[in-house]
């Protein structure tokens, strides 16, 4: 099998859990649109493929390929944390390798480049064995990636087994941070089960990223200048964010639950939009406390809550707040955040949610859970000053009411928050303008991946 300079074959290896695969597909779609002669074979688990490619018709030059999820036939899940992820990781290299060989046979084209989620560190080995470039995509921010790239330094300085009770300690030696709370470093650096498959995956990732032909991250220079500067000295870094650019004008057929008409009837910057993503829902006691705070403060709210709301919310809450609220199983988040009536986004501080809030110019109330949530919350509150973190990272009625009052009341603090997030919104809007860094870096990425020079 041989390939010409055009008609190349690119393998895309996403991490098929949480919200990782969607932003990977988003940037691949942009590359595929600019390089119509290049075939992008997108490998993921059957469930992920079904979610990302609901139509049976292929997307022009992007071809989905299902690979094994690593779950043995007849396996019964025990409910342990990350059990499905651990099974996938154990079989991941072999699963992707088998998928790529099948795609080469199907297309009659050798793979010329491997593009992977940075989590899939073993993609470096696969690319080396194939003799092709390895390009990696980091779907989170530069701040969390910097911590993973300097894990050895952090552990040597603070000690791997001497961190209990030191969560509130402020440290000033981590490259990319003027200072950071020790407990806000990403999971797997000094806190959590450091020997778990997930933590080991992150550690190994940090050890091999320097081998990548490019490390494209979902951020832009103006948002994280110091972490970007540090990473650029260590890696072949390309800031190509936001991976999910600001959406086109709202379309009614994307709003099946009528969120936008409901928002149209509300005052400007008065509504709290609540959305915790797909894997980070607060426990029932916190959901109840959040509901009580919304009711007691008479805050209008739109809540994206997939589960039966009556199952978690206080008795009679839905009836008592019927004039204030709209609770839906799904909301068109980008459209909602862009609406003039939304005054705050209550979320888990996942990177995608943070970036979408920045793009829309909406302040944040954050309740972090795990992963990069804590360091994102640190950046939101202490560096960018575009929101507040729920005190103690636990919703209580009193704490939540205080946060709502701080962000939604028309005082000096609220004005400062909106001015700050508005500043970063302008940076996000300009990121893909002519001759801007993200635009130039995306062209560089396209040249590396597809051999195109725009």
UniProtKB/Swiss-Prot annotation:
EC number: 2.4.1.115, 2.4.1.294
Positions glycosylated per UniProt: 441
Gene Ontology biological-process annotations: anthocyanin-containing compound biosynthetic process; cyanidin 3-O-glucoside biosynthetic process; positive regulation of anthocyanin biosynthetic process
Residues annotated to bind UDP-alpha-D-glucose: 331, 333, 348, 351-353, 356, 372
Expressing tissues: Mostly expressed in leaves and flowers and, to a lower extent, in roots. In flowers, mainly observed in petals, stamens and scapes, and at lower levels in pistils and toruses.
The keyword NAD belongs to this UniProt entry's keyword annotation: no
Pathway participation: Pigment biosynthesis; anthocyanin biosynthesis
Signal peptide as annotated in the record: 1-21
Function description: Flavonoid 3-O-glycosyltransferase involved in the biosynthesis of anthocyanins conferring flower red/pink colors, mainly anthocyanidin 3-O-glycosides. Catalyzes the addition of UDP-sugar to the 3-OH of anthocyanidin, with a preference for UDP-galactose (UDP-Gal) as sugar donor and cyanidin as substrate; able to use delphinidin, pelargonidin, peonidin and petunidin as substrates in the presence of UDP-Gal, but barely active on malvidin. Can also use UDP-glucose (UDP-Glu) as sugar donor with cyanidin, delphinidin, pelargonidin, peonidin and petunidin as substrates, but not active on malvidin.
Protein name: Anthocyanidin 3-O-galactosyltransferase 3GT6
Organism: Rhododendron delavayi
Lineage, highest ranks first: Eukaryota, Viridiplantae, Streptophyta, Embryophyta, Tracheophyta
């Amino acid at each position: 099998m041989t390939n010409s300079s055009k008609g190349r074959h690119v393998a895309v290896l996403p991490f098929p859990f949480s919200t990782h695969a969607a932003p990977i597909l988003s940037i691949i779609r942009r590359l595929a649109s600019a390089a119509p002669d290049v075939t992008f074979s997108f490998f993921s688990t059957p469930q992920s493929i079904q979610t990302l490619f609901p139509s049976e018709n292929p997307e022009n030059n992007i071809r989905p390929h299902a690979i094994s999820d690593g779950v043995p036939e007849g396996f019964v899940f025990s409910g342990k944390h990350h059990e499905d992820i651990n099974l996938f990781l154990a079989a991941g290299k072999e699963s992707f390798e088998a998928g790529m060989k099948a795609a080469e046979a199907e297309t009659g084209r050798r793979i010329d480049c491997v593009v992977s989620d940075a989590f899939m560190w073993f993609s470096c080995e696969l690319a080396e064995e194939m003799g092709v470039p390895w390009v990696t995509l980091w779907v989170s921010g530069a701040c969390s990636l910097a911590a993973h790239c300097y894990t050895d330094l952090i552990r040597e300085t603070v000690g791997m087994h001497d961190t209990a009770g030191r969560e509130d300690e402020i440290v000033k030696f981590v490259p990319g941070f003027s200072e950071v709370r020790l407990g806000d470093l990403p999971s797997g650096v000094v806190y959590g089960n450091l020997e778990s498959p997930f933590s080991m995956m992150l550690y190994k990732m940090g050890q091999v990223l320097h081998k990548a032909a490019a490390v494209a991250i979902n951020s832009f220079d103006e948002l994280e200048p110091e972490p970007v500067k540090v990473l650029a000295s260590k890696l072949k870094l390309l800031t190509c964010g936001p991976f999910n650019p600001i959406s086109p004008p709202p379309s009614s057929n994307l709003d099946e639950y009528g969120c936008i008409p409901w928002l149209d009837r509300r005052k400007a910057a008065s509504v709290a939009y609540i959305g915790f993503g797909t894997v980070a829902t607060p426990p029932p006691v916190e959901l109840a406390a959040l509901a009580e705070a919304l009711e007691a403060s008479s805050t209008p709210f739109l809540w994206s809550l997939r589960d039966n709301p009556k199952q978690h919310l206080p008795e009679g809450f839905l009836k008592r707040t019927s004039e204030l609220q709209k609770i839906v199983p799904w909301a068109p988040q980008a459209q909602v955040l862009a609406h003039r009536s939304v005054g705050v986004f209550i979320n888990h501080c996942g990177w995608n949610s943070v970036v979408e809030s920045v793009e829309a110019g909406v302040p944040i109330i954050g309740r972090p859970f795990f992963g990069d949530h804590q360091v994102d919350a640190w950046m939101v509150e202490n560096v960018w000053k575009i929101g507040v973190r729920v005190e103690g990272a636990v919703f209580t009625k009193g704490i939540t009411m205080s946060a709502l009052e701080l962000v939604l009341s028309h005082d000096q603090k609220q004005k400062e928050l909106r001015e700050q997030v508005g500043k970063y919104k302008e940076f996000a809007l300009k990121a893909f303008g002519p001759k801007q860094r993200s635009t130039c870096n995306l062209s560089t990425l396209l040249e590396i991946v597809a051999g195109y020079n725009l």
